[in-house]
Design a protein with these regions (language model features):
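Membrane-embedded alpha-helical bundles of multi-pass transporters/translocases
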Residues: 1-470
Length: 470
């Protein structure tokens, strides 16, 4: 696969940024179509909860492990044992994903109400999420699609082929847009339940296409995996060893997100999760355009240099990545804070009114404070993964999740009950967002203290090297 070349990071990030712009444009059209079709309502919240849950479950079970462990292990196997061995590793991983994630998808389809309860347990009204449970029966299979797509993207990224993994969401968005555009006429002619089935089936079809469109590109790089299951594969054991600490971080994320969704339903009944979802579209835009592209391209080079024990290059890559992340994301965060309301006026169509715009804008103002820190935290995660040591990162995620969940419950839910008569629920909901910057920053300093000496002082490098090889 060649030696690392940090000069290609900017070029690769540029390609991904262009494709991400196209993806985000279609993503905005998708969100606008959703806002026009179902507005900010109980149906909208049900859709958001049910649609986010498959990705959360995939991340909880396998996602964090695959994202952090697959690429460096795959690159190591291909370099040391050749193409055939790396193909066997990929085939083994795909076989295990089909077994594990396929089983979880089946459980989600059968026991959908129980899965949805994990996101609404504080609301006390289980019947309000019946529609979410119905849609989740369609969405559960997405858990498997996300897992397979992650492996395909990881293989392509390892070969510095970023086109299809970045362009695939565009196809997903186009299909979902068509589903939402058809919601109103289908509901008018056949009833609302038929319209719900349309958007549920269309959303799942979009995720399937996002996964499947990457398969043809694998052959161009000589990747022809034979799907099988071998739990004794040394590469699989290395993947699990590296991924287990990541599992703790993923559990923390799942718990904190579940508490946030449940608290949102308490603080802002029926529409709380919708407020979060609409605000996060703007919040994730600069991250997707700049930070995600930069960290993805940088991750490949960091993994290669870590495999070669070239810690000076690792140091250079991490330092440059942090500087670029802050340089781009701080101005974007200020922009979101200043122009929150004008930006969210784009939603004001169909069933989405100005009161909804005000709620989403207030939430976005507080949430935007964490944007630069969020980008750096993601880069820290990529750096620890490239160095094959996720234990420190997982520990910091645990501390952060405890603090954030405590803040949400104390200031969002408890204060929400105390101040219920004031009807200032929008400001209380913003407290949920305000907790994110504080606890994100709590991850960065200790993580940086670990990463910086790793590349700076030779003695520490030797100590870390022994730890990684253990």
């Amino acid at each position: 696969m060649g030696s690392s070349d940090y000069s290609t990071v900017g070029r690769s990030a540029g390609l991904m940024t262009i494709l991400t712009i196209v993806s985000r444009v279609t993503g905005f059209i998708r969100t606008w179509a959703m806002a026009a079709a179902i507005g900010m309502s109980l149906l909208s919240s049900s859709y958001q909860v049910a649609n986010n849950l498959p990705n959360m479950l995939y991340e909880l079970v396998m996602g964090g492990m695959l994202v952090t462990a697959f690429l460096p292990v795959y690159m190591g196997v291909r370099r040391e044992q050749g193409r055939e061995a790396s193909n066997e590793y990929v085939g083994n991983l795909l076989g295990i994903l089909l077994l594990v994630l396929g089983g979880i998808s089946l459980l989600g389809t059968v026991f959908a109400p129980g899965f949805i309860w994990t996101q609404s347990f504080l609301s006390g009204d289980g019947g309000s999420m019946d529609t979410a449970a119905f849609m989740f029966r369609f969405f559960a299979i997405q858990i498997l699609f996300y897992g397979l797509g992650s492996v395909f993207s990881g293989v392509l990224n390892a070969h510095r082929d970023y086109f299809w993994s970045t362009f695939a969401p565009v196809l997903n968005n186009v299909i979902v847009i068509a589903s939402f555009m058809g919601f109103a006429p289908v509901s008018a002619q056949f009833g609302e339940r038929a319209g719900i089935i349309l958007i549920a089936a269309g959303t799942t079809l979009g995720v399937f296409v996002q996964m499947a469109c990457q398969i043809p590109a694998l052959g161009k790089h000589g990747v022809h995996p034979h799907i099988h299951i071998d739990f004794k594969d040394p590469a699989l054991r290395q993947t699990i060893a590296l991924g287990i600490p990541t599992l703790l971080a993923t559990v923390c994320m799942f718990v904190s997100t579940s508490i946030t969704n449940a608290a949102a339903l308490v603080v802002q009944p029926e529409t709380g999760p919708s407020v979060i979802a609409y605000a996060r579209l703007w919040y994730t835009l600069p991250y997707a355009l700049i930070a995600a592209s930069l960290s993805t391209a940088l991750y490949t080079e960091l993994s290669h240099d870590a495999q070669e024990k070239d810690y000076d290059s690792v140091r250079t890559g991490i330092s440059r990545g942090v500087a670029q992340m802050l340089f781009f994301l701080i101005p974007f965060a200020l922009y979101l804070i200043v122009f929150a309301r004008p930006l969210n006026m784009i939603y004001c169509a169909g069933k989405f009114d100005e009161s909804g715009v005000a709620l989403v804008s207030e939430f976005l103002i507080y949430l935007a404070l964490s944007l630069p820190l969020y980008g750096v935290v993601v880069l820290m995660q990529k750096s620890f993964s490239a160095l094959l040591d996720m234990k420190p990162y997982s520990r910091y995620c645990l501390y952060s999740a405890i603090g954030q969940a405590g803040s949400v419950l104390l200031f969002g839910v408890v204060l929400g009950f105390v101040c219920r008569r004031l009807r200032d629920l929008g400001r209380l909901l913003a407290v949920v967002a305000a907790s994110s910057p504080a606890w994100s920053s709590g991850q960065i300093y200790p993580a940086w203290r670990v990463l910086w000496p790793f590349a700076r002082w030779p003695g520490c490098c030797r100590r870390r090297r022994r730890h990684v090889g253990a």
